[in-house]
Amino acid sequence: LVAPEDIGDKPQVKYGNDAEPLLRAFFALDHPEYGMAFTPFKIMRHEKHPFITCTPDGELLETGTDRRGGLEIKTTEIMSSSGWGRWKDRIPDEYYAQVCHQMLATGWEYVELLVQIKYTTTAGEDRKEVRHYKIERADCLDDIALVEQSAVLFWSYVTERKRPALKLPPI
């Protein structure tokens, strides 16, 4: 086996780690309708499949309804005009898949996704844009089921010490 590359010193990773507590605090200020808890390095596990885990950026409780949800914080940088296409009227697939995975692992009813996008304008000005998305579990039940099915299949390869197919199936 080859040890994975340590990316902890990369500027983008450092920025994301440093920005996360500040973005969490801004979210709390902007959304008094939630109670929020954060425990660093907390690992939450699926009740039936303990190999399905997540480490939340925040746990939310909706005031008045007591609906439980999560907060996911992302920082990203768009380096070209084509990068905006991934954000046009949607969130990128990898972020959506992670949110579905979190709802699967935790049973949450929703996830609030807070994204800070850094970019440079055509005039050369550095800018930041913060976007907020609320993803409801009820709206993505089929996708959560697909994530569960895929995770269980992958884990079967691990427990049976089998190498999975090299070509990924279409999603």
Locations of the language-model features?
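Accessory terminal regions of nucleic-acid processing enzymes
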Residues: 1-171
